[in-house]
Every structure is written in C-alpha cells, then in structure tokens.
Amino acid sequence: MANIKVFALGGLGENGKNMYIVEVDEHIFILDAGLKYPDIDMYGVDAVIADMTYLVENKDRIEGVFVSHGHEDHINALPYLLKQIPTRIYGTHFTISLIENLLSDNKMNIKHFKLFRINENKVLGFGDVSVSFFNTSHSIPESVGIAIHTKDGSIVYCTDFNFGPTNYGKYQTSFDKIIDLSKKKVLALLTESIGSGAIDRIKNDSLLEHSYKNILLNMKGRIIISAYSSDLSR
C-alpha cells in the first residue's frame, strides 16, 4: 500500500492563496500556487502567499506544479516558488501563456524554467504514479481538473468549476472523463466549496448581452464597465 498524504499550504478555509500538496511515497505533487490579496486591516501588504518552507526542505522529491487554471489566486505565487525551487510547471496552453507573462513581468527569463503545455488527453508518468487531466468549465479558458493515480486509487482535484452552459463551445466540461474516473477507485475528491450553498442555477453568459443592450440603449449618461482581464469570453 502506498503512503499517501494530502494537505493544504494555502486555500483551505480561505478564499485565495491556493496551494495543495499530494505526497505518494517519495513523490510530491503541488497543485496550484496562488496568492491572496490582503484584508483591509493588513496595512502595507500587497499580497499573501503560502509558507513554502516544507517544499524547500523537500525540493528533491517534488515532481512539479500542476496548475488547474490561470487565475491569480492559482498561479501568482509561482515566481516566489520558482526562485527557490526550479521545478517543472504543467498547465494548458492558455494557462502556461499566462504564466510566461507573469514570469516576464517579474523580470524572470522564461527560457530558464521548465514549462510544459498539456491537454486533457495527456497522461504523465512518475514511477508508479500517473497524472491525467480533464476539461472543466470556468470563467477563464482551458481550465482543467487533475487526477493523480496511485496503485491504491486516485486523488481527484477539481477547483473553481461550474456546470453551466457557455457561449464558447470550445471550453466545456468533459463529463465522459469524469464518468470514467468515477468507475475507478477514488480515494479523495479535492473540490471547491465557494458558492456550493447557493440554490440558484448558474446563468448563461449569453444573457449578459441582452442586459447590456438594454442599458446601453436607454442610458443617457456615461457608462463605465469593469472587466477581468483573463475573462476573454465576457
């Protein structure tokens, strides 16, 4: 039987600073590496990241960072991590592109780092352990769930997702792969809980177009619209 440990360095019981660790025997897998913006009473603090001391002390056992998507609370601690641990980073094409921009903004040469683009058909092997992926729907393109497969069963990581329909059909949840995972032995499901208490159905993004048209056509004054830079479809 494999010696399996699962714990969070950040993101558990808080919104942001996502970083989860899965250990399988001698292998360490890092799931996401994000930051958290400070509370209003944390004066002089620009961002909060997880304590990475344990990872630095065990850096020779780390197989890489497996990134679910490109939001700041899931990737923006990577520059701090990579300065201490030059490990491999795995993510979808769009996510890795965001990480490349992030590293460049931090004056870090992307050629010095091991950035690997994956898709949901990619399976990575690390001795007796393998890692697979499945597409999820989110407010950012190319988000994925991650499954770590051991000889005793799988640990499935699926954060920040929804099952709502989208108006950009390229990015959809892979229900077939989720069904395949459910047919195998799943030891643990690590999933997001924000919004889980809401009883309302998620609204289709295409409904925004109708709302905006009404506002734009009837408003006589100035209209200011905020946008989230990574939310390309909206």
Question: Locations of the language-model features?
Answer:
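His/Asp/Glu-rich metal-coordinating catalytic cores
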Residues: M1-F66, H71-R234
